[in-house]
Amino acid sequence: MTDQPQQLTIRRPDDWHIHLRDGEMLEAVAPFTSEICGRAIVMPNLVPPVTSVAAARAYRERIVAAVPAAHDFTPLMTCYLTDGLDPDEIEAGFAEGVFTAAKLYPAHATTNSAHGVTSIASIAKVLERMQKIGMPLLIHGEVTDAHIDIFDREARFIETVLHPLRQQFPELKVVCEHITTQEAAAYVLEGNQYLAATITPQHLMFNRNHMLVGGIRPHLYCLPILKRNIHQQALRDAVASGHRRFFLGTDTAPHTRDRKETSCGCAGVFNAPSMLSAYATVFEEIGALAHFEAFCSENGPGFYGLPLNEDKVRLIRQPWTVPESIRVGGNGDNLVPFLAGETLNWQVVL
C-alpha cells in the first residue's frame, strides 16, 4: 500500500463558472475566489442582466475593485443571451477582449433567468456568428417545461435541445455547465473537441439523499438539483478517467442565510471558501489525484485556448474546519458556506 501524500502542489487553478453577484455581496465573496484562482468565468445573471459590452466592462471594473490588491486575478466576462441580442454586439465584445464567452439560460431555468432564451431559433444568428469567430457557448442545460420532472430536465435538454443545436452548429464550442447526470457525462465523453463540461464539488460529493434524508438541507439545494447516487457515481467516474474535456467549475452561488433557510428558499451553493479542499477530497477518495491538477488548472485553459497560469498553489494534509458563516455587509446578513462546520483534511496554504 502506498503512503498517503502529505501535500499537493498544483498550477494555480481557474474557476470556469462563478456567480459573484454585485454590491456588498460581491465585496464579501470575491476574495474567496481571487485568492485561490487566477481567472474565473463570471456569470452574467445580474438584475438587469449583462447583455452589452458596456455593461460587461462596467461589471468587470466593479469586480476588480472588490478584489484585494495582493491578489493576481482576472475576471473573464460573459454575455447573457436574449432573444433579441445583436450578433454584432457579441462579436465586438469578443474582439475587444471584454466577452470571453456567452451564456445560454433557458428562460426561467435558474436564478435571474427570466430574460433567458425562449428558443434556439431566436438566437440562431448569434450562434452562427459565435461559431464563426470561435466564441464558446456556455449552457445551463435544463428544459423548463412545467410538465417535465425536475430530476429529468437535464437529460431531456440533451435530447431535445443540445443535440439538435450541435448538429446545426457542429463547430460551435459548447460547455455543458455543472453537469449532474450520467446522460450528460456520457454525452461529453462521446463528443468531439468542440464539447466540454464543468462539474461542481457538491455534485461530486453528494447526491439527493444527502439533501433530503433525515431532514431538508437547504444549503445543498442548487440547480440543476442533486440527482440519484448513480448519477453522482457517473460524474466521479468521468473525472477519475482523466478525460481532458471535464474541468473545474464551482457554480458558487451565494445567497444570504435568510434567503436559503425559508419556506421557499433560493437555489445556490456558496462553495468558494472550501471548493479546492472539497475537490481534493473527492479526487483522493476515487484514487484520481494524478488527474487533480489537470482538472483544476489545465483542461479549462486548453478548451478555451488560453495560457496556463504560471504560479502554484499548495494544499497540505492538515485538518481544518469550514466556517459556520461569513458576514456580508454591515446589516447582520451572513452566508453559510458549503460544508459549513465540517472538517476537511486538505487545507490550502497561501
Swiss-Prot record:
CDD domains: DHOase. It catalyses: (S)-dihydroorotate + H2O = N-carbamoyl-L-aspartate + H(+). Substrate binds at residues 19-21, 45, 140, 223, 255, 267. The keyword Metal-binding applies. Binds 2 Zn(2+) ions per subunit. Zn(2+) 1 binds at residues 17, 19, 103, 251. Keywords: Hydrolase, Metal-binding, Pyrimidine biosynthesis, Zinc. SUPFAM superfamilies: Metallo-dependent hydrolases. The keyword DNA repair does not apply. Its EC number is 3.5.2.3. Pathway: Pyrimidine metabolism; UMP biosynthesis via de novo pathway; (S)-dihydroorotate from bicarbonate: step 3/3. The active site is at residue 251. Homodimer. Catalyzes the reversible cyclization of carbamoyl aspartate to dihydroorotate. This is Dihydroorotase. The lineage of its organism: Bacteria, Pseudomonadati, Pseudomonadota, Gammaproteobacteria, Enterobacterales.
